[in-house]
């Protein structure tokens, strides 16, 4: 019984090894084609350097060696069976694949199959999808170079080369932006940034200069207005000094309007007094031809003149008129001038000129 079990286990291990060898041959071809041939649109210049395999390695298991130096990839149990911790810890890493104790890709449905068979099934599905998407003409077999592993590598390392032209245009724009940033020293500012900043600085300088000019003009206007007001006040003070009733001790200082009104009334009064003086001089000039019969008429004229202006009451001559009808006018001329002693001597000019 035990011998039969040992023979059955040995036969199963031999079948598993044969299946794994056949899988290794086909997988090696696909992996080599995927890593050696660069599809259009894929740039491997930024990809991490791969470790070179020794040329003497002709084992079909060489394709399962780790392709990246960091060992990124997941573990594959060795082809000899050995479950438990020895099967999980002693495997080799395959980039982009997940093969463990739970099956391929973490699927429990494939955990009952041997590792090689599960891997073969997974590769078959991926190859079918990749061949339909990337075929340029005719049908491709699952053993062809275009498999799902290349798609996984491209998606992990860079953008998909089968993307739309719109996405390609976007990447070209990004590259152009990066080149512009390098050309401008990596400052991140647009080319017109410093120029626009200088223009704003120049505008600020112009506005400050304009404000200074306006301030100087305003100061000049204020100074001129101050001088004008000072001159006006001085002129009004001189006018108050001339007006008789403006500088009295009992009268407070008049305002500007009151000073101007008082000056107007004083000028009108002086004009009226001058007119009365002219009438009196005309009357004196006509007195040489006056007779005794004309005395009442002259007295009436003097009364009318006194009624016009009270100041002329001192010049009233009706009561004590010094002239008489029988006296010559030459004898009465000095007496007439003596009555008007307050008037200037030019009024009696005719008395001094006559013999």
Swiss-Prot record:
Renumbered residue ranges of the record's region Disordered: 34-90, 128-215
Alphabetical keyword list: Neurogenesis, Nucleus, Repressor, Transcription, Transcription regulation
Tissue: Brain-specific, with the highest expression in the cerebellum.
Database matches in Gene3D superfamilies: Helix-loop-helix DNA-binding domain
Disruption phenotype: Null mice exhibits aberrant expression of brain area-specific genes and structural organization in the somatosensory and caudal motor cortices. In somatosensory cortex, vibrissal barrels display postsynaptic disorganization. In caudal motor cortex, anomalous differentiation of corticospinal motor neurons is observed, accompanied by failure of corticospinal tract formation. Mice also develop self-inflicted skin lesions and show significantly enhanced scratching responses to pruritic agents, due to the selective loss of a subset of spinal cord inhibitory interneurons.
Classification via SMART domains: HLH (SM00353)
InterPro entries: bHLH_dom (IPR011598), bHLH_transcription_factors (IPR050359), HLH_DNA-bd_sf (IPR036638)
Keyword Transcription attached: yes
PROSITE patterns hit by this protein: BHLH
Cellular location(s): Nucleus
Ranges of residues in domain bHLH: 216-270
Primary location recorded for the protein, binned into one broad class: nucleus
GO cellular component assignments: nucleoplasm; nucleus
Biased composition (Gly residues): 81-90, 185-207
Protein's job: Inhibits DNA binding of TCF3/E47 homodimers and TCF3 (E47)/NEUROD1 heterodimers and acts as a strong repressor of Neurod1 and Myod-responsive genes, probably by heterodimerization with class a basic helix-loop-helix factors. Despite the presence of an intact basic domain, does not bind to DNA. In the brain, may function as an area-specific transcription factor that regulates the postmitotic acquisition of area identities and elucidate the genetic hierarchy between progenitors and postmitotic neurons driving neocortical arealization.
Name this protein carries in UniProt: Class E basic helix-loop-helix protein 22
Species the sequence originates in: Mus musculus (Mouse)
Encoding gene, per UniProt annotation: Bhlhe22
């Amino acid at each position: 019984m035990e011998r039969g079990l040992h023979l059955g286990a040995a036969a199963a291990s031999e079948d598993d090894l044969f299946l794994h060898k056949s899988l290794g041959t086909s997988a090696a071809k696909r992996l080599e084609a995927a890593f050696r041939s660069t599809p259009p649109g894929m740039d491997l210049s930024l990809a991490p350097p791969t470790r070179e395999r020794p040329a003497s390695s002709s084992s079909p298991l060489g394709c399962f060696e780790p392709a990246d130096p960091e060992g990124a990839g997941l573990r594959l149990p060795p082809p000899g069976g050995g479950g438990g911790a020895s099967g999980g810890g002693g495997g080799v890493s395959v980039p982009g694949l997940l093969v463990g104790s739970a099956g391929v890709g973490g699927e429990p449905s494939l955990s009952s199959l041997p590792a090689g068979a599960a891997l073969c099934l997974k590769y078959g599905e991926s190859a079918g999808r990749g061949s339909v998407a990337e075929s340029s003409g005719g049908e491709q077999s699952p053993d062809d170079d275009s498999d799902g592993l290349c798609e996984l590598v491209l998606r992990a390392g860079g953008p998909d080369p089968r993307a739309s032209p719109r996405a390609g245009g976007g990447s070209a724009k990004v590259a152009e932006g990066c080149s512009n940033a390098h050309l401008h020293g990596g400052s991140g500012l647009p080319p017109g940034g410093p120029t626009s900043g200088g223009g704003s600085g120049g505008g600020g300088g112009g506005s400050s200069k304009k404000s200074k000019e306006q301030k100087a003009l305003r100061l000049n206007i204020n100074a001129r207005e101050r001088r004008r007001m000072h001159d006006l006040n001085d002129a009004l003070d001189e006018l108050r000094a001339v007006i008789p009733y403006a500088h009295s001790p009992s009268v407070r200082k008049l305002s500007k309007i009151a000073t101007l009104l008082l000056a107007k009334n004083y000028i009108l009064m002086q004009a009226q007094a001058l007119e009365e003086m002219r009438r009196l001089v005309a009357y004196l000039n006509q007195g040489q031809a006056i007779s005794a019969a004309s005395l009442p008429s002259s007295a009436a004229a003097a009364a009318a003149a006194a009624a016009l202006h009270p100041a002329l009451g001192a010049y009233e001559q009706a009561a004590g008129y010094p002239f008489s009808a029988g006296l010559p006018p030459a004898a009465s001329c000095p007496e007439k001038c003596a009555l008007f002693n307050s008037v200037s001597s030019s009024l009696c000019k005719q008395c001094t000129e006559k013999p």
